[in-house]
Amino acid sequence: MLSSVWVALGLSLTCTSAFSLISPAWFQTPTFSFGILTYCSWPQGNSWNQSCVTFSSLEDIPDFAWKVSAVMLLGGWLLLAFNAIFLLSWAVAPKGLCPRRSSVPMPGVQAVAATAMIVGLLIFPIGLASPFIKEVCEASSMYYGGKCRLGWGYMTAILNAVLASLLPIISWPHTTKVQGRTIIFSSATERIIFVPEMNK
């Protein structure tokens, strides 16, 4: 049961993170929107007639802060995807092959992915000071959008980063010391594992 929940959470988090990365709605005006990898423009009052451009390489991204942010966010997403695939294989593997089902494997990978995503999200608004964005957002600067307002894509990316950082915290086994022995409590099972104390 626990493994299926973690697989569902890992896969859904990976999918929504990918969706927010390709979204052009991180910051927007009435006629323009942009994200980490895509920007779109349309005539005033006709948002159904959009013309969108995707940055095909890092050289096409207009600002260095954007490039760093894109690398961090894509790296974090790749780690999330790797972790989700690993969780899926862990969940469908026979119990004899993976005997320790009491805790979720590799919470550290997910923690590194969450850290990379958070750093990428914090670096991205520095790019609001670039000439490319100043032309659209008028009077924008670092961490200030000018006439551009936050879009749902950036908010979704923030929510994904928060969830990605909470999941590893939940999955770490809880430990307590009782009479010289370490007892590992796992919320996944009702077993208690006694670990003898090592002499220092």
UniProtKB/Swiss-Prot annotation:
Q: Which UniProt keywords apply?
A: Membrane, Transmembrane, Transmembrane helix
Lineage, top ranks? Eukaryota, Metazoa, Chordata, Craniata, Vertebrata
- Where does this protein chiefly localize? membrane
One Pfam family, short name:
L_HMGIC_fpl
| Encoding gene, per UniProt annotation | LHFPL7
- What PANTHER family does the record tag this protein with? LHFPL TETRASPAN SUBFAMILY MEMBER 7 PROTEIN, LIPOMA HMGIC FUSION PARTNER-LIKE PROTEIN
Say which domain of life the source belongs to: Eukaryota
The protein's name in its UniProt record: LHFPL tetraspan subfamily member 7 protein
The UniProt family comment states: Belongs to the TMEM211 family.
Report TM segments.
5-27, 68-88, 113-133, 150-170
Membrane topology term reads:
Multi-pass membrane protein
Q: What species is this protein from?
A: Homo sapiens (Human)
Q: Which GO CC terms are listed, alphabetically?
A: membrane
Location in or out of the cell: Membrane
